[in-house]
C-alpha cells in the first residue's frame, strides 16, 4: 500500500491527463514539439505509461550503433515510436491503477533506490503507506532529476521542487 498523496502528486506533476489518454498524450507531444521548434526550453511529453514502458523494457539504449547512433533525430523518432507502441499495449492490457502501481514499483529514485518501497525506506526510513504529503512530494519531485533534487545532498533544491509539486497538487 502507498499513501494516496504519492499518486496524486505523481499524476498532478508528471502526467496531468493520465486518466484521459491511452498511453500517449497528443497535447503534451504537440506542446513539446512546438517548444522544440521555437527553441524554447525542452520539456518532457512522456506519459507515466511511456515512462513505465521505458523502465520495464529498456526502450532507450545507451549504446546506439550504426546509422541510429549518428542521426540524433532519427534515433529519437525510433525510441519514441517504440515507447508509444508499448505504452498503448500496456494501456490495453492493464488498468490505470495497475499501470501507476507498476510505475511506482519500477521507477528510479536515485541512490540505487528503485521503486516507492525502497525510496520511502532510503530517504525517510518509513513505509510507502506512512509517507506524509511533504515526503511524497519530495519523492515525486526527485523524478525530474534524482541527483539535483536529492533531499540529502541538495536539500534546498529538494525543498523548492517539493513546493512546486505541492502547488501542482492544489491546482
Question: What residue ranges belong to the model's regions?
Answer:
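Peptidoglycan glycan-strand catalytic modules in the bacterial/periplasmic cell-wall system
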Residues: 1-171
